[in-house]
Structure formats: structure tokens, C-alpha cells
């Protein structure tokens, strides 16, 4: 009960603040995070972003806090201007400089090499493990960089750099992924039935705050996925099944992290008449995934499974950079067998309780589905044998989308049994 009271009081206090004051606090926290990251990170791309972003965050935080003490007639316009300033200072400038310096997270090189292979008609799933050793390992690089832990469609972000030995300028995969993220998220925000105030908050968390800006400037592979998921959510809210199927299908054809929402959407999708259209959504998603994936599965099924499933789950016998000190990884380090068993057991137990919850609250609303997926993501991230703290952006965004839709009290899709 005490925890519930504290949560409710904190929520009431936050809601009592003006939108600009809330922005100022978020940007101030972002400035602190950027400064700490600059001091503590050992990865050049990350600490450079931290030092570059702390100034814009701090400046905009001060402006927002000062203006938040006044009653402004065009508060949303001021918030939007400050948002643009932050995106320029914490995303575009660091991204441009780091592209010029050629400092990036390892996944950027992995995606660019896959694009080069794809442009030559070759399979991006070159490396695989057999009898405890890596086959076709790329010389001169860590073993984990030989793996391509994505679905084939992710290779398209590496195609612009395919004609050059080294990606430069606009051909850098991060630039392409950032453009894709901005286009998809902009379309989604325009489509969403939310107030301008809520849309700005969604854009802040997705793009402007470190939950988006850090990843866009240094790695970026999860950002197009999140933008497409947001577009899928907007389409579900507006009951546009075809658009929902295309956006969720594209996301699912890039990375496994899109699958929970792509599957969950089947429970809440409906048309303007209120009838369930889950079959049409299923056709779109499965068709896109099948067309882009099956040729590679047929060509080398073992290599595909080794890259897309075994490696991300820590079962490929290769040291992965996805080694954040979360419970699942710690347990796997101490007791490997128990660590690898924990995730599937948690998945089964969690699936049981989720099904009970869904049955009790049937029919599910879109807001409630997003909340369930947010909790599920957070739990699985903690118990997975190979994971990274950066995946927290998935449950954070899903929780925010659920919250703003619930508070907005929009008419949400529910499953209508026919």
C-alpha cells in the first residue's frame, strides 16, 4: 500500500507541473546522463556523444525551466522549438561528427558489411558455429562481429555503403537509419489521435532524449524498429489494418524485437466497422517476413539459425557485447546451465500469467496490450542470458505509448469475436 501511495503521489506531482517544466526536468536529467556517460564510458562513440550532448541538453533545460514558470499562450510551439534544438544538438551534430571520425558501435559495421554482401548477391549469414568453433570468421575482427543477428531486411541500411570500401558521410548506415526513423516516426505522430502535448512527449522519448539520441548517433539499429512499431500502433489506433500490417511486417522482417507487438496486434486490430481484421494483418506480416527471409533460410538454414537465434540468445559459444550485468547474464556466468534455462522457464510462466490476465480483462484494448508488452520486455531483458541495458528503450517507449493513449481516452481497438 505504501508503494502504491508513493506512486500515486509522484504521478500527481508530475501531472501538476506545466508541460515546459516537465520538459526542463527531463532535459536536465538527460544532461546529467550525458555528462556521466562522457566520464565513465570506455567506448569512443558513447563518451564523445556524452560530451557533445551535455551542452545542448543543459541549455534547453534552463530555458524550459525558466519559461515554465510563466503562463505561455503558445506553450506547445515553444516546446516544439526546444525539441528541434535538442534534436539538432544531441542527434544531428554528434551524428555528423562521429560519422566523420568513423566512431561507431560494432553493429554499424556489421550492417554495412551485410549490405556489401547483399549487393554482390551473397548471403549475409556467412559465419556460424559448429562443434564449438566459428566457421568463416572475419579475420582481424572480434568473433562476434562475424555474426549478423538480424533478419535479412536489415541489410538494406548497409546498401548505400556497398560501393565503397569504407562508409563515409551520407552512406554511413547510421545516417540511413536516422532518416528512416525520422520519416516513420513523423508519419506515425501525424497519424496518432493524441493531443499536441502528448505527441511532443512521445517524440522526446523516441528521438530527443538519450533513449533515442544516444542510439541514433552511435548505433541506431533499434531506432527504425521502434519508429515502425510506433507507426503500427498509430495505424491500429486509426483502424488502418493494411498500414498496420505493412509497418509491423517490415519491423518484424528486420529484428526479433518487433515480433511481440506484431503478434500481439492480432488481438486488437479491427476495421472502422468494429470487426476483427486479424487475418488480413496476419497475411501482411507473414508475407513480408516470408518474402524477405525464406530465400536465405533455404540457402543456409543452419547459418541462419546460428546468426538470428543462437547468437542473440548467447547459445553460439561466442563472447557477445550484449553482456550487461543483469540477473540473467550474471546467473549464466556463474551457472551456465541454469542461466540458459531461466529465460525459457520465465517465458513459459510469464506466458501463463499473461494469458490469465488477458482472459480476465477481455477484450484487450490497445493501451492495455502495450502495457503488457512493456512489462514482458522488461522481464525478459532481465532474465535473458545475453542482453544489454540499451534494450530498456523498448519497454520505456511501449509504456509511454500505453500511458498517453490511456490518459487521452481515445477510442481504442478491441477484439470483436465473430
Segments and roles (model prediction):
Residues 245-248, 393-396, 410-413:
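Composition- and surface-driven signal marking solvent-exposed, interaction-prone regions
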Residues 1-83, 90-233, 269-392, 396, ...:
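Primarily membrane-embedded glycan-assembly and transfer machineries that use lipid-linked glycans
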Residues 242, 246-270, 291, 385-391:
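Transmembrane helices and adjacent periplasmic/lumenal helix-loop junctions
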Residues 243, 276, 321, 411-414:
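Juxtamembrane helix-loop transition sites at the ends of transmembrane segments
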Residues 403-418:
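A juxtamembrane structural motif centered on a specific transmembrane helix
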Residues 84-86, 416-417:
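Nucleotide-activated chemistry modules centered on ATP-dependent adenylation/adenylyltransferase
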Amino acid at each position: 500500500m505504501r508503494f502504491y501511495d508513493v506512486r500515486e503521489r509522484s504521478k500527481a506531482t508530475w501531472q501538476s507541473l506545466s508541460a515546459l517544466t516537465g520538459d526542463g526536468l527531463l532535459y536536465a536529467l538527460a544532461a546529467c546522463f550525458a555528462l556521466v556517460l562522457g566520464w565513465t564510458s570506455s567506448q569512443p562513440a558513447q563518451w564523445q556523444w556524452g560530451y557533445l550532448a551535455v551542452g545542448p541538453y543543459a541549455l534547453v533545460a534552463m530555458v524550459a525551466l525558466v519559461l515554465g514558470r510563466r503562463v505561455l499562450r503558445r506553450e506547445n510551439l515553444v516546446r516544439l522549438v526546444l525539441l528541434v534544438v535538442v534534436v539538432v544538438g544531441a542527434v544531428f551534430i554528434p551524428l555528423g561528427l562521429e560519422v566523420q571520425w568513423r566512431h561507431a558501435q560494432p553493429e554499424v559495421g556489421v550492417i554495412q558489411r551485410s549490405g556489401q554482401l547483399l549487393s554482390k548477391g551473397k548471403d549475409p549469414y556467412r559465419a556460424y558455429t559448429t562443434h564449438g568453433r566459428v566457421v568463416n570468421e572475419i579475420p582481424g575482427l572480434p568473433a562476434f562481429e562475424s555474426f549478423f543477428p538480424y533478419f535479412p531486411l536489415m541489410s538494406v541500411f548497409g546498401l548505400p555503403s556497398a560501393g565503397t570500401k569504407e562508409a563515409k558521410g551520407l552512406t554511413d548506415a547510421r545516417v540511413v537509419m536516422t532518416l528512416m526513423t525520422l520519416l516513420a516516426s513523423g508519419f506515425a505522430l501525424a497519424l496518432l489521435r493524441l493531443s499536441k502535448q502528448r505527441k511532443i512527449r512521445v517524440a522526446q522519448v523516441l528521438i530527443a532524449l538519450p533513449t533515442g539520441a544516444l542510439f541514433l548517433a552511435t548505433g541506431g539499429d533499434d531506432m527504425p524498429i521502434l519508429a515502425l512499431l510506433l507507426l503500427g500502433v498509430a495505424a491500429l489506433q486509426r483502424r488502418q489494418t493494411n498500414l498496420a500490417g505493412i509497418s509491423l511486417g517490415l519491423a518484424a522482417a528486420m529484428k526479433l524485437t518487433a515480433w511481440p507487438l506484431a503478434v500481439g496486434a492480432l488481438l486488437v486490430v479491427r476495421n472502422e466497422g468494429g470487426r476483427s481484421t486479424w487475418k488480413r494483418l496476419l497475411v501482411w506480416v507473414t508475407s513480408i517476413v516470408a518474402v524477405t527471409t525464406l530465400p536465405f533460410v533455404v540457402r543456409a538454414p543452419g547459418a541462419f539459425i546460428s546468426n538470428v537465434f543462437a547468437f542473440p540468445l548467447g547459445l553460439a559459444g561466442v563472447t557477445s557485447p550484449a553482456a550487461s550485468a543483469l540477473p540473467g547474464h550474471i546467473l549464466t556466468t556463474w551457472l551456465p546451465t541454469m542461466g540458459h534455462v531461466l529465460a525459457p522457464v520465465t517465458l513459459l510462466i510469464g506466458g501463463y500469467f499473461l494469458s490469465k490476465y488477458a482472459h480476465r480483462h477481455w477484450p484487450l484494448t490497445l493501451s492495455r496490450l502495450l502495457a503488457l508488452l512493456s512489462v514482458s520486455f522488461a522481464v525478459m531483458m532481465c532474465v535473458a542470458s545475453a542482453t544489454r541495458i540499451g534494450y530498456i528503450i523498448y519497454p520505456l517507449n511501449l509504456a509511454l505509448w500505453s500511458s498517453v493513449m490511456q490518459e487521452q481516452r481515445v477510442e481504442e481497438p478491441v477484439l470483436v469475436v465473430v
